[in-house]
Each structure stands twice: as C-alpha cells, then as structure tokens.
From Swiss-Prot:
Keyword Transport: yes
Catalysed reaction equations from the record: a ubiquinone + n Na(+)(in) + NADH + H(+) = a ubiquinol + n Na(+)(out) + NAD(+)
Keyword Mitochondrion: no
Record EC number: 7.2.1.1
Keywords on record: Ion transport, NAD, Sodium, Sodium transport, Translocase, Transport, Ubiquinone
Purpose of the protein: NQR complex catalyzes the reduction of ubiquinone-1 to ubiquinol by two successive reactions, coupled with the transport of Na(+) ions from the cytoplasm to the periplasm. NqrA to NqrE are probably involved in the second step, the conversion of ubisemiquinone to ubiquinol.
Name of the gene: nqrA
Gene Ontology BP term (one): sodium ion transport
Full protein name: Na(+)-translocating NADH-quinone reductase subunit A
Length: 447
C-alpha cells in the first residue's frame, strides 16, 4: 500500500448517505463542449433534429476520428455557444428509447478480443472520450498508444460517493470492462483503490492493483501516476474513471451504450444528502429540484474544490463528474471578523478556534475571506501537497507564466484538480487551476 501523509480531508458538513436511490425523471441532457480540453467541434446535427442514443453529435476537428455521441434519444433542443463561438453545450430534450446498437460479444470472447476491435467499438460508441491523457488531460488520438492506463476506483474528494458501493452492484460489468481495457494495450492497467476496499479485478497478465491511503488527494489520478508511473514530455499515460469502466463492460456484452451515472448529492444545503442514480449529462436543476434548503445556494457539478457552477448553458452534469455539491453563497460581511475566535470557521492555519476542533464538521460557503493579495509562502502549500515537487516554486512559476521552470518543476504531471487544495489554502486567493491550464497550453503549443 502507498500511504501519503500530506494532504487535507476537508471537514465539510453534509456528507451523503452511501445508499443508492433512484433519481427523478430527467427530460434534458447535454454534452458540455468546454469540458474537453483543446476540442474544436465539427457539428453533425442541428437544432430541432431528432437523434438516437449513441448517435454522433459532433467530431473533434483537431483530433480526427474522435466522436461525441448522444447520451439519450430525443430532439436537439439547443446548441449554446459562447465568446468566439466556443461550444458550451448541446442540449437534448429526451424523448423515446431509440438507440444505435454497436458490436457485442459473449463474455467468454472478451479475453481474446483484438486491440483493433476494442478500439473501434470504443471510438464508434463515444466511450473513447472517457479516456484522458496525462500530461495535458486531453482525449487521446484514435491511433495513440499509452505507456499505461490508470483506472481510478477511489474518490477522496469532499462529499464524494464511495466507489465500492457503486462497483458492488455492477461487479461483473466492472471486471469485464477491465478485461476489455487489458486487450486495448499490452501495457500495464493500474487499478487504484482505497486501502482495504473491496474492488474486484481480473486475472489478466497486464492488470495490477494498487492500494492508496491517507488524506485527499490520495484518490486523485495525478497522485497515483506520480507514485506508480510518472509522466513527462515523452511519456504519456491514460486515465479512466471506474463508472466508465462499468459502461465499457456493458457495451461490449450488450452492444448498447450505457449512460447511467450514480452521483453523490451532498452539502449542508441539501435536505437529504445521498447517492442518486441518473444519466450522463443530466440537467442539474432537475436533479436538485425540491432537494435544497431555501437559500442563496451555489450548485456545483463536481467537487467543491474543483467543480463547475451548474447554471444556464452549463446546468448539466459534467462528463467527468460523479458528484453534485451544494454550498451557500457567502455574500455577508463580518465586522472585525478577524478579531473573533470563530469556532465555526475552519482554517488550515491556527488563525481560528475552528482549526483546533479536530472532529467538527463545518458549514462552508463560497466566501474566500479576503481579497486578492500577494502570494505568501508560509508553508501551507507544502502541508497539502504529497507529490515530490516544490509547490511554492512551481506555483510562483504558474503565476508569472514561466513555462520552462514550471516544466522542470513537474507541471506536466498535474491537472487542475491536483492543485485545488493549493488554491483552497492559498493566503493570496489565487486560483492555480486556470493558471496551470494556461501554462500547459503554452507548453503544448510552443514545446
């Protein structure tokens, strides 16, 4: 087992009950274009057109052959675009059960599938988009070969679901998905799970299971990659989430695209935090209807540390998100709040009484408790960064855009989620995720 000591389990109240309930009926689903790093769509549909589940909606011009398919059947209700015509979302009004069928195999044949057959079925069904590269967190090219594939079967994000609960009810599909991935490449398939977690595996020669323990970010793919198979400019690995592995297992046996998702609905603003069974790209406002405390709430697709606000054209469950988090907007001002002992406020430093209440869960809001200021290296980054890098120096390089130094310090190993804790504990109130993405884009473009 690999146990990390540095990190932070955010003591946030509103943790979901680890029991799966059926979610409400969903009448709108969408694909969010801005989730796919560097993607430039070539649209294959138009507004008002009827589509089947699994039908191609658009293709990536910059990554030919990579297609994005409909998560449900119905009609194209809207195609939202932002500045410079950036694709924000393709919305489908759900109707009927028409779907496209893909190649299917008897379970006994999965262990003998060729890499070409696996690749073709994943690409045509749109499940190829479940894979992401590291570095850069992009969908891999259809002819690319990874150095390894990392299956993330754990989650240490605040208010997250326990993956073992979800995997347990689909154990055979999960094992079949692993078997299919083992036929995609001869390289290692690293299945990463929490210490002692009951996660099934397959006996394929290239599948290895690893256990991780410790605080968040022990459950992030970036942490797994760093300790097992570090990447670099000339070494690429792929990552995939456990629910997508289940979907792959079902696809190859049934020939049907499975877009079911189990998400954790959590936060103190939720009346009954729990796990909900829904569909990929579900309209978040429908999922949360009647579920929230009547207040000024912020609904987030994903983690409170690194999720996206779910509203307007983005009011849909993200492709790579397994949770919906709800916290109150922090709009109120405190007079001389810094003088009070503040037992109800958490801080990683010893500036509040709440820091010393080790077993207490706190009500977090969107307030950042201060304005923008200079980056102050007081050791907070080092306390939450378990990777073998120099976080203060790296973060400073990200702020000034020094790509050469950032690359030397290990930025190619990272994704936005890997720096979310650094943003949370930053006294200067910097958001390091967008700064990292900007530097990565420059490195990819200029080398």
């Amino acid at each position: 087992m690999i146990k990390i000591k540095k990190g932070l389990n955010l003591p946030i109240a509103g943790r979901p009950e680890q029991v799966i309930y059926d979610g409400p009926a969903i009448t709108e689903v969408a694909l969010l274009g801005e989730e796919y790093v560097g993607m430039r769509p070539s649209m294959k549909i138009k507004e008002g057109e009827a589509v089947k589940k699994g039908q191609v909606l658009f293709e990536d011009k910059k990554n030919p052959g990579v297609v994005f398919t409909a998560p449900a059947s119905g009609k194209i209700a809207a195609i939202h675009r932002g500045e410079k015509r950036v694709l924000q979302s393709v919305v489908i009004a759900v109707e009927g059960n028409d779907e496209i069928e893909f190649e299917r195999y008897v379970p006994e044949a999965l262990a003998k599938l060729s890499s070409e057959k696996v690749r073709r079925n994943l690409i045509q069904s749109g499940l190829w988009t479940a894979l992401r590269t590291r570095p850069f967190s992009k969908i891999p090219a259809v002819d690319a070969e990874p150095f390894a594939i990392f299956v993330n079967a754990m989650d240490t994000n605040p208010l997250a679901a326990d993956p073992t609960v979800i995997i347990k009810e689909a154990a055979e599909d999960f094992k079949r998905g692993l078997l299919v991935l083992s036929r995609l490449t001869e390289r290692k398939i690293h299945v990463c799970k929490a210490a002692g977690a009951d996660v099934p595996s397959e006996n394929a020669a290239n599948i290895e299971t690893h256990e991780f323990g410790g605080p968040h970010p022990a459950g992030l793919s970036g942490t797994h990659i760093h300790f097992i198979e570090p990447v670099g400019a000339n070494k690429t690995v792929w990552t995939i989430n456990y629910q997508d592995v289940i979907a792959i297992g079902r696809l190859f046996v049934t020939g049907r695209l499975n877009t079911e998702r189990v998400v954790a609905l959590g936060g103190l603003q939720v009346n009954k935090p729990r796990l909900l069974r829904t569909v990929l790209g579900a309209k978040v406002s429908q999922l949360t209807a009647g579920e929230l405390v009547d207040a000024d709430n912020r609904v987030i697709s994903g983690s409170v540390l690194n999720g996206a606000i779910a509203q307007g054209a983005h009011d849909y469950l993200g492709r790579y998100h397994n949770q919906i988090s709800v916290i109150e907007e922090g709009r109120s001002k405190e007079l001389f709040g810094w003088v009070a002992p503040q037992p109800d406020k958490y801080s990683i430093t010893r500036t509040t009484l709440g820091h010393f209440l080790k077993n207490k869960l706190f009500k977090f809001t969107t307030a950042v408790n201060g304005g923008d200021r200079a980056m102050v290296p007081i050791g907070t980054y080092e306390r939450v960064m378990p990777l073998d890098i120099l976080p203060t120096l790296l973060l400073r390089d990200l702020i000034v855009g020094d790509t050469d130094s950032a690359q030397a310090l290990g930025c190619l190993e990272l994704d936005e989620e890997d720096l979310a804790l650094c943003s949370f504990v930053c006294p200067g109130k910097y958001e390091y995720g967008p700064l990292l993405r900007k530097v990565l884009e420059t490195i990819e473009k200029e080398g």
